């Protein structure tokens, strides 16, 4: 049947195998109003069980995970956050921060091994994403620690000085964002075969999580250098711990993943026409990431308070994660519309049904390029018996010899 959105002939099903749009069912059928349209907001491309507007961290930052693994990752994240929060409520903030600092990186390493997408070159991918981000994050935090303490000490009597606010809320976040891009951009230039929008998102998220983890450990060490237990109410420790161990890594991951996805989409071979959607435009991604990095730090310095600071970081992290989710969704739709199909069938890891090996599952609409390497099982089409070659041909039959007068050989 012909897709009304991209105009290509697509196998019958609920979704177009090329552009992922919802197809009308039956002769003269119509698509439900909320399911129509090229944007396909009712079904997120990497996990059609969720809406595009679902606030889901796992399916946004770890798009290759199959459904069962994604559910397990959500439980691990929830339990880890609760454990870190429980430790923080006991006023052991450094321990809670270290526990929270390793939570998302552990999830990433599990994800990296489970999806097996980069099993050909795991060392270089890990080294230039997570490890490079961690080293640069630790270096930046240690390098600026004494400078910030000195600037802060000069203005204790009348609130933060202008120089401290500029350094802490503008220079440091923007410099950190640039450092988070170093590793992924190195991969971009030295490994051009990683040319998929999913590669860009995963590399950016990995670098950001490594950066945030190292930054959190340095912050915890700075607290350990003083008393381990400090005074104050419960929220004096709980909210800062959640901000440092959860919201800040998510903010970094959303910002860096958004930028890297836009960069990788520009050279994706499956997207011949450059996307015109704002969410996938590189200038917009850079501007959104810069605002998301600076705004919460600036508001925290200008309007202090632990609860207010938590709210600023929560809003910034949620906004950047949503933009990264929209950018990935639209990017997968854009590249799918240019994809070419082959004759094999695959088993979709989401709905477990056979579907043509195109850009999207014809049954549930999942972007098959977002499937783990082990998740999509290809089923070869029935093979026709090969033509008999010389080795397989039956032995030739000798022509009958002519007989003599008495039936003997001449």
Where are these regions (language model features)?
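Hydrophobic alpha-helical segments at protein termini of multi-pass membrane proteins
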Residues: 1-410
């Amino acid at each position: 049947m012909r897709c009304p959105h991209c105009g290509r002939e697509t196998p019958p099903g609920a979704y177009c195998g090329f552009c992922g749009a919802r197809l009308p069912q039956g002769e003269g059928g119509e698509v439900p109003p909320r399911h129509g349209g090229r944007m396909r907001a009712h079904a997120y491309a990497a996990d059609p069980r969720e809406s595009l507007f679902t606030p889901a961290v796992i399916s946004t930052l770890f798009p290759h995970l199959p459904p069962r693994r994604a559910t397990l990752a959500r439980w691990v994240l929830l339990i880890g956050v609760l454990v870190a929060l429980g430790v923080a409520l006991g006023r052991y903030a450094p321990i809670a921060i270290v526990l929270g600092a390793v939570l998302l990186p552990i999830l990433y390493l599990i994800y990296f091994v489970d999806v097996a997408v980069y099993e050909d070159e795991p060392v270089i991918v890990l080294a230039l994403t997570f490890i490079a981000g961690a080293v640069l994050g630790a270096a930046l935090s240690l390098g600026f620690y004494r400078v910030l303490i000195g600037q802060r000490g000069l203005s204790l009597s009348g609130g933060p000085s202008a120089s401290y606010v500029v350094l802490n809320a503008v220079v440091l976040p923007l410099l950190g964002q640039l450092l988070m891009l170093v590793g992924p951009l190195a991969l971009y230039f030295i490994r051009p075969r990683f040319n998929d929008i999913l590669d860009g998102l995963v590399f950016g998220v990995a670098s950001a999580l490594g950066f945030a983890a190292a930054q959190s450990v340095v912050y915890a060490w700075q607290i350990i250098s003083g008393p381990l237990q400090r005074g104050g109410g419960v929220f004096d420790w709980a909210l800062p711990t959640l901000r440092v161990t959860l919201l800040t890594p998510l903010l970094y991951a959303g910002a860096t993943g958004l930028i890297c996805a836009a960069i990788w989409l520009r050279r994706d071979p499956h997207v011949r026409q450059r996307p015109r959607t704002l969410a996938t435009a590189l200038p917009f991604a850079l501007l959104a990431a810069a605002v998301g990095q600076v705004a919460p730090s600036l508001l925290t310095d200008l309007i202090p308070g632990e609860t207010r600071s938590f709210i600023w970081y929560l809003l910034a992290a949620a906004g950047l994660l949503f933009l990264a989710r929209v950018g990935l969704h639209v990017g997968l739709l854009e590249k799918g519309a240019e994809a070419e199909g082959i004759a094999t069938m695959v088993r979709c890891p989401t709905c477990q049904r056979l579907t043509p090996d195109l850009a999207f599952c014809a049954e549930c609409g999942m972007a098959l390029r977002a499937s783990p390497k082990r998740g999509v099982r290809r089923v070869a089409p029935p093979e026709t018996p090969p033509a008999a070659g010389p080795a397989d041909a039956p032995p030739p039959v000798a022509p009958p010899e002519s007989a003599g007068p008495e039936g003997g050989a001449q």
